[in-house]
C-alpha cells in the first residue's frame, strides 16, 4: 500500500514539474511586456481600487459592468493590502499565478475530452491579441475556463471539493456560468443516481441565480442588439480568423467554411459523443455571448475588443484537438491537425502586447504633495488616452504610511498634476488659466501654435508647431506655486520636456495630450516663485507642444 501511495505521489510530482514549466514558458512569451513593465489597467484602477478604499471587503459583492467579479477583486484587495507602490507588480504576478493554476488544472483534470497538456497549451496559444493575459481585472476570463472543464469532469473521481470551489469562484466572477449551467443539468440527467453530481449542479444553479440577480438589479449590464443579418460574419470572424485571420485575412471565408464543415462532419459521424455535442454547444454559446456584448461588426481578433474571441477560440481549439486525437478517419485527423498548426502560425503576429510606461511609483510619490491627485490608469496601453484613479492628499498619505516598500523620494516627484476633461464635461475656459502672456521670458522660440490653431476669447496659444511638428525651440515662463495653464501635444513625446528650475525637481518628459489638458503647478514642495522651461527638441513631424496663456 505504501509503495502504491509513493508511486502515486511520485507520478503527481513528475506531472507537476513537467506541466508548470511549459505553462510558465508559454505565459512569459505572451505576457512579457506586462511582467517587465506592470501597470494598473481599466476598471481595476477606476472601480476595484476606489471601491476597496471606500467599502473594504464588502466591495467583493459590488458588481463591475453589471456582474460580480470576485476573483479579480480578491487579487486587487490582497495586492494593495501588501503595497500600494508595488501594486502593479504584485497584482500582475498574482494574475499570472491564476493563469498558471488554470493551466495546471486544465492539463491534469480527469475529464472526458482528450488532450491533457495540449488543451492547456491551446489556451495560451490563441491567435488573438493577448488582451486578457496577465491583467488582474481580466483574471476572471481564466477562471471561467474551469467551468468548461467542470462540465466534462469524470464523475467517478473523488474530488468534489475542488469542483465545488471552482464552481463558486468562477461562477461569481463571470456570466459564463449561465452558458455552462445547462450542460451541468444534462450531466445530472445521465448521473441522476449520483448525489454529489446533483449537489454540485444545485450549487452551480445557486451561483448562477446570484449572478443573474446582480445583473438584473445593477441596471448596468449592456447587451448589444444581435443583428441576424450579420450572422454570416461568424464564419469569417470566429472560425476563419482562428486559422488565418492575422496572416492572410483575405482567405478567412474559405478556411471558415472548411473548419465549419470539418466540425459538422465530425459530429454527424459520432452522434452519440457527449463530448463533441458539448463542445459544439459551448462554441455556439460563447460566440452568441460575445456578439451579445458588442456588435459583431466591431469585433476583430487583433484590434477590436479581442477578449471576445477568447472563449470561442479556446473551445474551437479543444474541438479540433478531439478530432486530431480521436477521429478514426485519417483525412479528418490530418485536416484538424493542419488547422491547429496553422493557428499557431496565425498567433505569431499577436503573440504579445506592448504598452507605454505610466510611472506609477513617481505619481504615487507626487500624490501627497497635492490636495487631490489623478493617477493615470491604462485603457488600451497608449499613454495618449488614460483613465484616472483620483485620490486625496489624506488618502495618499494613509496608503503610503502603511506601505512597507515605500521610501520617501529624494526628488519632489512631478511638479504639476495633469487634469483631463471627460468629453461630457464642459471644455476648459479662460478662468482655468492663471498664467498671463506677460510671464513669457525674453528669447521665446515657440512662434507657432497647435495644428488646429486653437483660439479662445482672452487666451493666447503659443506652440512649437509651425508648418509641421518638425519645429523645435523652447519657451520660459515665470510662475508662482498654484498657477495653472493649458497644454496640448502631438502623439509622440520623446523630445518634449518640462523643466522646473527649483530644487528637488528634475526635467520631466511632457505628458501626451491629444486634447487640451490643465497643468496645475501646485506641488507643495515648489517655491513661491520659479521658472519653467518648455522644450521641443525633436524634429519629428509628429512631435510638437503648445500652451494656452491668458491674454493679459
Language model regions located:
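Hydrophobic/aromatic-rich transmembrane helices and adjacent perimembrane loops
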Residues: 140, 300-325
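Transmembrane helices and adjacent periplasmic/lumenal helix-loop junctions
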Residues: 165-186
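Intrinsically disordered, polar/acidic, low-complexity terminal segments
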Residues: 2-129, 158, 162, 186-187, ...
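Short beta-strands within extracellular/lumenal beta-sheet-rich domains
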Residues: 454-484, 493-496, 516-519
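Transmembrane alpha-helix segments characteristic
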Residues: 21, 271-297
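Membrane-interface transmembrane helices that cradle and orient dolichyl/undecaprenyl
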Residues: 148-162
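Extracellular carbohydrate recognition and processing domains
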Residues: 501-545
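Perimembrane helix-loop-helix junctions
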Residues: 180-206
Amino acid at each position: 500500500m505504501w509503495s502504491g501511495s509513493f508511486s502515486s505521489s511520485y507520478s503527481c510530482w513528475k506531472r507537476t514539474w513537467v506541466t508548470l514549466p511549459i505553462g510558465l514558458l508559454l505565459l512569459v512569451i505572451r505576457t512579457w511586456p506586462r511582467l517587465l513593465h506592470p501597470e494598473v489597467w481599466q476598471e481595476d484602477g477606476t472601480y476595484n481600487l476606489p471601491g476597496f478604499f471606500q467599502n473594504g471587503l464588502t466591495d467583493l459583492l459590488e458588481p463591475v459592468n453589471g456582474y460580480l467579479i470576485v476573483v479579480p477583486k480578491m487579487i486587487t484587495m490582497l495586492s494593495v493590502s501588501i503595497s500600494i507602490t508595488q501594486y502593479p507588480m504584485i497584482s500582475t504576478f498574482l494574475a499570472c499565478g491564476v493563469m498558471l493554476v488554470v493551466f495546471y488544472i486544465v492539463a491534469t483534470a480527469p475529464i472526458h475530452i482528450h488532450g491533457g497538456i495540449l488543451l492547456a497549451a491551446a489556451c495560451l496559444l490563441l491567435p488573438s491579441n493577448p488582451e486578457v493575459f496577465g491583467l488582474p481585472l481580466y483574471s476572471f476570463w481564466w477562471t471561467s475556463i474551469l467551468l468548461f472543464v467542470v462540465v466534462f469532469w469524470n464523475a467517478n473521481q473523488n474530488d468534489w471539493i475542488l469542483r465545488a470551489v471552482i464552481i463558486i469562484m468562477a461562477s461569481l466572477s463571470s456570466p459564463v456560468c449561465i452558458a455552462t449551467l445547462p450542460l451541468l443539468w444534462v450531466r445530472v440527467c445521465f448521473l441522476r443516481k449520483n448525489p454529489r453530481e446533483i449537489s454540485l449542479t444545485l450549487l452551480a444553479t445557486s451561483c448562477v441565480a446570484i449572478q443573474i440577480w446582480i445583473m438584473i438589479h445593477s441596471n448596468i449590464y449592456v447587451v448589444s442588439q444581435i443583428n441576424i443579418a450579420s450572422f454570416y460574419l461568424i464564419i469569417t470572424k470566429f472560425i476563419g480568423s482562428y486559422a488565418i485571420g492575422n496572416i492572410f485575412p483575405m482567405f478567412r471565408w474559405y478556411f471558415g467554411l472548411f473548419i465549419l464543415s470539418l466540425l459538422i462532419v465530425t459530429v454527424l459521424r459520432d452522434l452519440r459523443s457527449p463530448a463533441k455535442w458539448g463542445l459544439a454547444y459551448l462554441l455556439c454559446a460563447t460566440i452568441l455571448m460575445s456578439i451579445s456584448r458588442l456588435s459583431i461588426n466591431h469585433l476583430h481578433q487583433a484590434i477590436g475588443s479581442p477578449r471576445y474571441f477568447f472563449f470561442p477560440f479556446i473551445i474551437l481549439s479543444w474541438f479540433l484537438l478531439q478530432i486530431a486525437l480521436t477521429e478514426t478517419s485519417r483525412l479528418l485527423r490530418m485536416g484538424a491537425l493542419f488547422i491547429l498548426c496553422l493557428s499557431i502560425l496565425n498567433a505569431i503576429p499577436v503573440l504579445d502586447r506592448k504598452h507605454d510606461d505610466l510611472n506609477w511609483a513617481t505619481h504615487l510619490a507626487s500624490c501627497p504633495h497635492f490636495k487631490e491627485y489623478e493617477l493615470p490608469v491604462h485603457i488600451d496601453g497608449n499613454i495618449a488616452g488614460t483613465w484616472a484613479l483620483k485620490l486625496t492628499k489624506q488618502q495618499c498619505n494613509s496608503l503610503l504610511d502603511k506601505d512597507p516598500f515605500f521610501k520617501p523620494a529624494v526628488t519632489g516627484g512631478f511638479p504639476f498634476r495633469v487634469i483631463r476633461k471627460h468629453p461630457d464635461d464642459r471644455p476648459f475656459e479662460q478662468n482655468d488659466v492663471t498664467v498671463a502672456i506677460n510671464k513669457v521670458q525674453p528669447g521665446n522660440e515657440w512662434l507657432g501654435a497647435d495644428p488646429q490653431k486653437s483660439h479662445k476669447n482672452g487666451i493666447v496659444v503659443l506652440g512649437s508647431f509651425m508648418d509641421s511638428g518638425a519645429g523645435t525651440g523652447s519657451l520660459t515662463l515665470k510662475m508662482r506655486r498654484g498657477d495653472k495653464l493649458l497644454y496640448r501635444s502631438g502623439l509622440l513625446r520623446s523630445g518634449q520636456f518640462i523643466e522646473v528650475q527649483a530644487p528637488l525637481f528634475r526635467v520631466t518628459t511632457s505628458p501626451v495630450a491629444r486634447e487640451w489638458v490643465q497643468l496645475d503647478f501646485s506641488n507643495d514642495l515648489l517655491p513661491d516663485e520659479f521658472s519653467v522651461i518648455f522644450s521641443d527638441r525633436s524634429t519629428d513631424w509628429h512631435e510638437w507642444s503648445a500652451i494656452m496663456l491668458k491674454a493679459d
